[in-house]
């Protein structure tokens, strides 16, 4: 299913469009409150002051250097005493700077984290509000996955940048500026030259970052496209699994990832260039600065060499500031691109896209009671992309209060579209709609919808309790603020009217039962009755029902008949394909091809002899079909007509309920190194790239130790005569330039190759992650919400990329640099180095290690928070129409706010502790410097250390300490990467373990060769409970056989276990006890992929995917194996021929927004065609005609008869007329088979089936 050309063009234009830039990121601060801004000002001041602490150290170093130089040339007892006193005094200043910096870093780190959380909480809420305030028409153009990705993942990127990383950036810039201020105070001439080079460097980096950000913005658009594909697949994962279509979604996903790889590789040169420029110009600055400093000294323009060295130390600290900027730049680049995406939603205030903005002056007659008189005048409407064909054409209708109106007509006649327009989801292309004489587009949309109760054809419930789902129907009404007791009374009354009370109270947790993600834990009929109760609970003046009985059995369908005949206090509009329900209405409106064909009472329309009579006669003919027109029986071998009875039905012992035999294992948690080793082992083809990058890492790691040696020699230069100072300065300046060239080349190689490696590995693991998710068993998706999975698919590969790209190269370089610096220190003076290293380094590493542990713990907590947030947002946006219909926007806002507040509280508590170690690791190098100067001075005073050796060791160890601090600066990245690697590699290991178990089971059952006997399905004493509710048995001792060529009907009340039977046959789940043999072998002995190719299913709620109609029909087949004639034949057999001919692009018509412009009947016929084209040996149909009109139902029924040759069918339905000619009918109740036989046999028994039949025929024979 390729992306259509229009979408690809839109994506390309968006990717090429210039991003919003740094200004968009700064706009995030508009979400700060006055308190937040006050805190941020204080934090910024603290960051500025903490940044100034290290440059102030340069002044102390300058004074100490002068002391060391003077002492080195004298060395008498008096100068020794003065020297030691000066060393001790200046060392104390280092301690004072440590205390100050530690306090300041703690304040700004926690403060920025606190305010960033609050700002992004407000931004997330505003973003969600903006999305929920959109019109349905505008929202149809985007998927919930891409929108929820903006609210969660993109906002996560912004929050990460504006938390402590913002403080680090401010501190780094302050350190850089303060370094130059200190340098200027010592020698303005020398500093001015070096400043020019820094400005050139920053200008180049700015240009590179701007170019890199454009690439990053394009990547974000591509990843949003990936989210759309993933949401498409995960939204109806059972259909994807049943048709073996995972590889198609993977192929689409991979196509996008190929483009991200191409774009991502463009980042390599920019990253390499950024680091190359940064370090090259730094060393060129050293070279020029040292040459010029020596010149000024020899000319007498600088008398004190300590001033020159103060400038050099200030520049060294400024270098550290630039180093601190580097690792944080990718986060800000990502945040800028993310802000651009977020503000496109926040700035989308066009009238046609926003409900509230489009009607700022809309009236809200709250004090006027709504009478419920609805009138449509010359109303026409066409869907986007099908403007040449009106879905509704010049409709004139009037609906009076206290009356019920049934709207009937063939599938695609425009019935559901009419409901959408009454809900103000779309705006008519012509004409008007009036409520009590007011144009509804001049009314406040929320007030309008608060007067309307809606039951959709495919009802959407939230992942909450049954009680909460029904109580949501009170939102926006006067009853919303009732006491909990009064609300409970209303909910229970509504459930009784909806015939839901009995099944709800039988559940173990009653009204507190969770319905699961996308209501996966309840049956279709139960879901529909809950939706009806939600519509009835507030007793709104207008009731709209769109195929509200499609999933209900005949007995429960009578609730609608009761509502139709009892409309005294409301206006009831009911859409149905069931003509029988329409007979109870006060008036019937017949739509055909978007026009009102006829209207009147049931009797009037029958007398008129028009379309209504034809529909009525067609349905009557279907219902009255008897054995004179049986479903064709092509099988040549005799077929038994009686299914074996279950032990329970025959009085045998009831099967015991077993615990689930194969729970999903927890994802194993391994340390980061173990995960990296596994990645390295399986990515051998990328070892050459890694090895080149590794060599570059080792080379770059030697830059700073070499710098320490050079600076140590430089300290000696100024102790000689002027003529020697000049010649030595020329030589060492050249050395700095040579080292700069080496740094430029090695960092360019490191940046390019490590970025390239990250791009390749990220694409691989993104695809592998998605593949592993799609290969999970169905029970996995019962436990993990699709919103959570979408969040993980987006965030985990990004977090892993943070480690396995340039950051990994920098980490290796830093680690090696620490070792090299320590070795040099030991080589020059082992005594001094041992104290400096082993007294200072353990403190640095201990603080850093604890920081990493806490950061990892915080990252795990943040992942949970992000997943819960993503699930909530995804649920809300997936049920967008329900949210709009029940005016739940404000309620969703408050629920999400409570969710975020709870998350923030957990974040603050953990962050308060972690920040202590962060502050210590940021400032501990000052303590190390104090110790180093004190002990080094002592050794010099004792004559055990020369000036050159002191400065070489000191600079090596200080730089090593700075490097160690930078190493732990990656702790947040490491913590997130560890979680991401565990998730990605862990879920793959689950797939492999499951595959191994399946293979072992198949090997154990190899002796079960496929039998050619007539038995296709043989279930014996099967017991089953869903893994999510292991103590609630759904099937109890089921035993039956289905023979080749048979059509077996399965009927029963809602929730009796009918659909569960099909789920077991599709191998979505495994029986807890008993045996299931299919196609002549134990079901577990089949290769699961090959097995599913021999089956096809038509689900109760058919799903269309983004792509063409043709793509949707051939979902279960490979593209190269499909003949166009087969597609046409399958569609014709499913009754789609005329509909497809009417589409502007025929089979190539795009199903945008998961087929939002298709009617329920049209979707169902596409699903039937999808099953028929598979030519399955066993065809499973779950309510295949629930959304079809009588003519289409008769057509499908004939189709099923025509295709029966060599095929076995199991048909689950509430419509008894569909199965009356089946070879065997199974009647289920409470998870058991209570009756079985042919229609005639069951009618003669006058048991459950007889009662259901009498009920469906209104007591008529």
Curated annotation (Swiss-Prot):
What is the protein name stated in its UniProt record?
Answer: ABC-type transmembrane transporter verA
- Amino acids binding ATP: 409-416, 1052-1059
Q: Where in the cell is it found?
A: Cell membrane
Keyword set includes Transport:
yes
**UniProt xrefs under PROSITE patterns:** ABC_TM1F, ABC_TRANSPORTER_1, ABC_TRANSPORTER_2
Give the record's GO biological process terms.
oligopeptide export from mitochondrion
What does the record give under GO molecular function?
A: ABC-type oligopeptide transporter activity; ATP binding; ATP hydrolysis activity
- A Pfam family annotated for this chain is ABC_tran
Query: How is this protein positioned relative to the membrane?
Result: Multi-pass membrane protein
Q: Which residues are glycosylated?
A: 67, 396, 463, 1007, 1021, 1106
Q: Which residues cross the membrane?
A: 41-61, 92-112, 166-186, 190-210, 270-290, 308-328, 686-706, 734-754, 808-828, 830-850, 913-933, 950-970
Q: What happens when the gene is disrupted?
A: Dicreases the production of 11'-deoxyverticillin A.
Principal subcellular localization: membrane
Q: Name one GO cellular component term.
A: mitochondrial inner membrane
Induction profile:
Expression is regulated by the cluster-specific regulator verZ.
Could you tell me which InterPro entries the record lists for this protein? AAA+_ATPase, ABC1_TM_dom, ABC1_TM_sf, ABC_transporter-like_ATP-bd, ABC_transporter-like_CS, P-loop_NTPase, Type_1_exporter
Q: Where is the ABC transmembrane type-1 domain?
A: 41-334, 691-976
Protein family membership? Belongs to the ABC transporter superfamily. ABCB family. Multidrug resistance exporter (TC 3.A.1.201) subfamily.
- Taxonomic superkingdom: Eukaryota
Positions of the ABC transporter domain: 374-618, 1017-1255
- Print the keywords alphabetically: ATP-binding, Cell membrane, Glycoprotein, Membrane, Nucleotide-binding, Repeat, Transmembrane, Transmembrane helix, Transport
The protein's job, in short, is: ABC-type transmembrane transporter; part of the gene cluster that mediates the biosynthesis of 11'-deoxyverticillin A, one of the dimeric epipolythiodioxopiperazines (ETPs) from the verticillin family that are toxic secondary metabolites. The verA multidrug transporter is probably involved in the secretion of 11'-deoxyverticillin A.
């Amino acid at each position: 299913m390729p992306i259509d050309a229009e979408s690809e063009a839109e994506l390309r234009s968006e990717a090429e469009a210039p991003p919003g830039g740094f200004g968009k990121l700064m706009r995030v601060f508009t979400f700060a409150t006055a308190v937040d801004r006050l805190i941020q000002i204080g934090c910024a001041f603290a960051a500025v002051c903490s940044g100034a602490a290290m440059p102030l150290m340069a002044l102390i170093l300058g004074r100490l250097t002068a002391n060391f130089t003077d002492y080195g040339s004298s060395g008498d007892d008096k100068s020794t005493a003065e020297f030691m006193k000066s060393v001790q005094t200046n060392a104390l200043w280092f301690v004072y700077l440590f205390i100050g910096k530690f306090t300041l870093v703690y304040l700004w780190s926690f403060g920025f984290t606190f305010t960033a959380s609050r700002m992004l909480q407000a931004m997330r809420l505003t973003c969600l509000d903006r999305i929920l305030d959109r019109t349905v028409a505008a929202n149809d153009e985007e998927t919930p996955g891409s929108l929820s990705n903006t609210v969660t993942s993109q906002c996560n990127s912004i929050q990460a940048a504006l938390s402590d990383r913002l403080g680090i950036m401010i501190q780094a810039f302050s350190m850089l500026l303060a370094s130059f201020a200190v340098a200027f105070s010592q020698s303005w001439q020398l500093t001015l030259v070096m400043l020019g080079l820094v400005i050139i460097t920053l200008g180049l980096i700015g240009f590179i970052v701007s170019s890199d950000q454009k690439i990053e913005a394009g990547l974000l658009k591509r990843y949003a496209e990936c989210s759309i594909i993933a949401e498409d697949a995960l939204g109806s994962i059972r259909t994807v699994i049943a048709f073996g279509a995972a590889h198609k979604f993977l192929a689409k996903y991979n196509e996008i990832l190929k483009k991200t790889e191409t774009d991502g590789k463009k980042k390599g040169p920019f990253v390499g260039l950024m680091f190359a420029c940064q370090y090259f110009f730094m060393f060129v600055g050293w070279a020029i600065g040292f040459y010029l400093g020596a010149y000024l000294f020899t000319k007498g323009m600088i008398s004190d060499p300590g001033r020159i060295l103060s400038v050099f130390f200030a520049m060294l600290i400024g270098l550290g500031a630039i180093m601190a900027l580097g690792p944080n730049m990718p986060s800000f680049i990502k945040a800028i691109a993310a802000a651009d995406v977020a503000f496109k939603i926040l700035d989308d205030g066009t009238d046609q896209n926003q409900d509230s903005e489009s009607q700022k002056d809309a009236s809200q007659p709250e004090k006027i009671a709504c009478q419920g008189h609805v009138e449509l005048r010359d109303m026409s409407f066409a869907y986007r992309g099908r403007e040449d064909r009106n879905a509704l054409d010049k409709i004139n209708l009037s609906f009076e209060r206290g009356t019920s109106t049934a709207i009937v007509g063939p599938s695609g006649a425009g019935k559901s579209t009419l409901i959408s327009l009454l809900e103000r989801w779309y705006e008519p292309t012509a004409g008007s709609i009036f409520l009590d004489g007011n144009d509804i587009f001049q009314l406040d949309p929320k007030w309008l919808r608060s007067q309307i109760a809606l039951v959709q054809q495919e009802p959407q419930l939230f992942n909450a309790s049954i009680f909460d789902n029904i109580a949501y129907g009170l939102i926006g009404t006067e009853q919303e603020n009732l006491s909990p007791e009064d609300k409970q009374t209303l909910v229970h009354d509504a459930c009784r009217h909806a015939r839901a009370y009995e099944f709800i109270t039988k559940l173990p947790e009653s009204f507190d039962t969770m319905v699961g993600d996308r209501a996966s834990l309840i049956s279709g009929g139960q879901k529909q009755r809950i939706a009806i109760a939600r519509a009835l609970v507030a007793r709104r003046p207008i009731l709209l029902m769109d195929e509200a009985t499609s999933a209900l059995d005949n007995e429960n369908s009578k609730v609608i008949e009761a509502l139709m005949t009892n409309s005294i206090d409301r206006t009831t509009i009911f859409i149905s394909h069931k003509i029988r329900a329409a007979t109870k209405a006060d008036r019937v409106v017949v739509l055909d091809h978007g026009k009102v064909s006829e209207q009147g009472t049931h009797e009037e329309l029958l007398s008129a002899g028009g379309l209504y009579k034809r529909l009525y006669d067609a349905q009557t003919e279907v219902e009255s079909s008897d054995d004179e027109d049986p479903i064709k029986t092509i099988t040549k071998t005799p077929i038994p007509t009686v299914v074996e009875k279950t032990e329970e039905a025959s009085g045998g012992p009831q099967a015991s309920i077993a615990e689930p035999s194969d729970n999903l294992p927890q994802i194993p948690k391994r340390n980061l190194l173990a995960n990296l080793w596994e990645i390295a082992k399986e990515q051998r083809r990328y070892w050459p790239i890694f090895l080149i990058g590794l060599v570059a890492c080792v080379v770059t790691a030697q830059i700073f130790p070499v710098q320490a040696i050079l600076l140590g020699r430089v300290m000696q230069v100024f102790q000689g005569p002027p003529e020697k100072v000049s010649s030595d300065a020329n030589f060492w300046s050249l050395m700095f330039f040579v080292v700069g060239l080496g740094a430029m080349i090695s960092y360019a190689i490191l940046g390019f190759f490590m970025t390239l490696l990250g791009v390749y590995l990220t694409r691989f693991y993104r695809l592998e992650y998605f593949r592993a998710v799609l290969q999970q068993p169905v029970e996995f998706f019962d436990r993990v919400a699709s919103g959570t999975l979408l969040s993980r698919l987006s965030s985990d590969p990004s977090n892993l990329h943070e480690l396995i790209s340039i950051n990994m190269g920098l980490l290796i370089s830093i680690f090696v640099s620490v070792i090299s610096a320590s070795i040099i220190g030991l080589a020059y003076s082992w005594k001094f180095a041992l104290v400096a290293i082993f007294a200072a380094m353990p403190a640095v590493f201990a603080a850093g290690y604890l920081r990493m542990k806490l950061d990892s713990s915080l990252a795990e907590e943040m992942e949970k928070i992000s997943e819960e947030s993503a699930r909530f947002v995804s649920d809300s946006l997936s049920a967008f129409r329900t949210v709009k219909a029940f005016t739940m926007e404000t309620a969703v806002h408050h629920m999400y706010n409570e969710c975020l507040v709870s998350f923030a509280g957990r974040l603050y508590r953990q962050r308060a502790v972690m920040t202590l170690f962060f502050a210590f690791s940021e400032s501990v190098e000052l303590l190390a410097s104090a110790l180093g100067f004190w002990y080094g001075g002592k050794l010099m005073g004792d004559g055990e250390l020369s000036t050159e050796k002191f400065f070489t060791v000191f600079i090596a160890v200080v730089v090593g300490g700075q490097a160690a601090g930078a190493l732990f600066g990656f702790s947040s990245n490491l913590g997130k990467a560890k979680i991401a690697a565990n998730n990605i590699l862990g879920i793959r290991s689950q797939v492999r373990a499951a595959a191994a178990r399946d293979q072992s089971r198949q090997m154990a059952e190899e002796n079960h060769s496929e039998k050619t006997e007539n038995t296709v399905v043989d279930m014996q004493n099967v017991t089953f409970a869903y893994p999510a509710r292991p103590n609630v048995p759904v099937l109890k001792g089921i035993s039956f056989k289905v023979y080749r060529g048979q059509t077996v009907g399965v009927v029963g009340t809602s929730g009796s276990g009918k659909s569960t039977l099909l789920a077991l046959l599709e191998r979505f789940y495994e029986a807890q006890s008993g045996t299931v043999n299919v196609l002549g072998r134990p079901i577990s002995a089949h290769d699961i992929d090959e097995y599913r190719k021999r089956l096809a299913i038509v689900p109760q709620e058919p799903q269309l995917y983004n792509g063409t109609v043709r793509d949707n029909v051939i979902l279960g087949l490979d593209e190269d194996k499909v003949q166009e004639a087969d597609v046409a034949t399958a569609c014709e057999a499913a009754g789609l021929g005329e509909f497809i001919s009417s589409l502007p692009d025929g089979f190539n018509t795009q199903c945008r927004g998961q087929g939002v412009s298709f009617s329920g009947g049209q979707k169902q016929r596409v699903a039937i065609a999808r099953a028929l084209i598979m030519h399955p040996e066993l065809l499973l149909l779950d309510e295949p005609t629930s959304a079809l009109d009588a003519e289409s139902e008769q057509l499908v029924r004939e189709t099923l008869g025509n295709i029966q040759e060599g095929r076995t069918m199991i048909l689950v339905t509430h419509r008894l007329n569909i199965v009356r000619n089946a070879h065997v009918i199974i009647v289920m109740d409470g998870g058991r088979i209570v009756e079985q036989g042919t229609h005639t046999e069951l009618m003669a028994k006058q048991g459950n089936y007889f009662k259901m039949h009498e009920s469906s025929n209104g007591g008529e024979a």
